[in-house]
């Protein structure tokens, strides 16, 4: 922090120029950046039968849920109780995206905490009268100074929950709306993984919006109506249940790993699969991408050498889109147990329909190092599995990189030092 302050000159000139601050803070460029960040962060988790994107010629849409018209919750934790800039809620974003021929009806339905279902009737009626329902649920952010649990935030520093399920009766609200038979889209507002098993099994479309910020309502609407093709990918693993915690993609080969790969007749727990609800790196698009022609050049290197991985990616759909190509590695044999896969690079590639591009990744000794039993960072000679795919669980292309022993210092078991230096 001190180095950054020195770099910015804050020790010699610690004061800001008020006139310049007025021009810069919340400028048009900053608002556009906030919108783009929200768009790119949204992850499409489910889209059964291509329910999304929606047509803007719908006659009626029901927007339901405690986070549908909640500006503060879109801003996340550590948000002032009084927000000076305007915030576009998801309800407002949907209203602004449709024409006058589309009737948008809003019903809160429930609170985020508590067991009050008195708003269910209004929500059910709104869903029944609409062509489509958008249910916006998730978490409560902010600060509370009361002992009433129902007035507390559910996410943020100092606020813990005992379950990863939706709090209060929000899960029941989704079920009630879905039971009307009206096609339903669930939008999540949250800062931690939510185990939405029922929705994942029964609701045709789920959009993970996180804490999308002041223009989050427009960003979500842009995704819902196809003005922006979703390209976000999960930077976390979403478990099916709190019983799966800790849940992360780069685990060591364990009983759970082998069970998930057919070691027993069970595929995980007695009650549910052992795989996550949504894996690390996962995210859908409104188009399809095909991977081909994996090349590892050269296929064999010395421990101190560099390597390049190439893959061809093609947009096989009818819409322009952005694919996030991910590179994972795994050392098959080594002196210590290594993770089943480790992310070593990713690239966002924009592709027009039918367009194909070659994506390349550079692998250096730092990428291949492991911490040995002597607590030294080393590159251990052997076979490395090279995996390129759409997520940690969707790997269409695999290859092998052979690393040979080198006579030089700092390789094959000798101390390489800190790989981050």
What are these regions (language model features)?
Residues 14-30:
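Flexible, acidic loop-helix segments that line cofactor/substrate-binding pockets
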Residues 2-12:
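Long, well-ordered, tryptophan-enriched scaffold segments
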Residues 3, 24-25, 32-421:
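C-terminal non-catalytic regions of proteins with extracellular/luminal or membrane-system context
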């Amino acid at each position: 922090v001190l180095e950054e302050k020195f770099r910015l000159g804050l020790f010699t000139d610690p004061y800001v120029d008020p006139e310049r601050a007025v021009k810069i803070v919340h400028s048009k460029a900053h608002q556009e950046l906030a919108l783009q960040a929200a768009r790119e962060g949204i992850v499409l988790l489910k889209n059964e039968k291509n329910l999304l994107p929606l047509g803007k010629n719908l006659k009626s849409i029901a927007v339901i849920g405690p986070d549908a018209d909640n500006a503060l919750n879109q801003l996340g934790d550590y948000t002032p109780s009084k927000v000076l800039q305007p915030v576009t809620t998801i309800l407002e974003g949907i209203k602004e995206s449709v024409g006058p021929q589309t009737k948008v009806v809003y019903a809160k339905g429930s609170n985020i905490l508590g067991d009050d279902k008195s708003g269910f009737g209004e929500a059910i009626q709104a869903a029944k009268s609409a062509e489509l329902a958008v249910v916006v649920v998730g978490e409560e952010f902010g600060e509370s100074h009361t002992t009433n649990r129902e007035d507390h935030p559910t996410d943020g520093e100092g606020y813990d929950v005992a379950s990863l399920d939706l709090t209060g009766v929000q899960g029941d609200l989704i079920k009630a709306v879905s039971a009307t038979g009206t096609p339903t889209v669930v939008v999540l507002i949250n800062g931690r993984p939510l185990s939405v098993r029922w929705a994942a099994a029964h609701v045709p479309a789920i959009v993970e919006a996180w804490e999308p910020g002041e223009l989050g309502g427009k960003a979500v609407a842009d995704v819902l109506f196809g003005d922006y093709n979703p390209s976000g990918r999960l930077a976390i693993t979403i478990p099916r249940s709190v019983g799966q915690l800790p849940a992360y993609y780069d685990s060591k080969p364990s009983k759970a790993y082998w069970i998930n790969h057919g070691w027993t007749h069970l595929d995980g727990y007695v009650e549910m699969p052992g795989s996550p609800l949504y894996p690390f790196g996962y995210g859908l698009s409104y188009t399809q991408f095909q991977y081909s022609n994996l090349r590892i050049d050269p296929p064999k290197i010395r421990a101190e050498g560099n390597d390049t991985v190439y893959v061809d990616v093609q947009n096989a759909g009818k819409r322009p889109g952005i694919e996030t190509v991910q590179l994972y590695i795994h050392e098959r044999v080594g002196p210590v147990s290594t993770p089943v896969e480790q992310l070593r690079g990713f690239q966002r590639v924009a592709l027009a329909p039918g367009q194909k591009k070659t994506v390349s990744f550079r692998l250096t000794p730092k990428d291949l190092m492991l911490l040995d039993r002597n607590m030294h960072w080393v590159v251990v000679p052997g076979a490395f599995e090279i995996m390129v795919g759409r997520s940690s669980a969707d790997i269409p292309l695999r290859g092998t990189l052979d690393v040979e022993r080198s006579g030089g210092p700092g390789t094959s078991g000798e101390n390489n030092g800190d790989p981050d230096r």
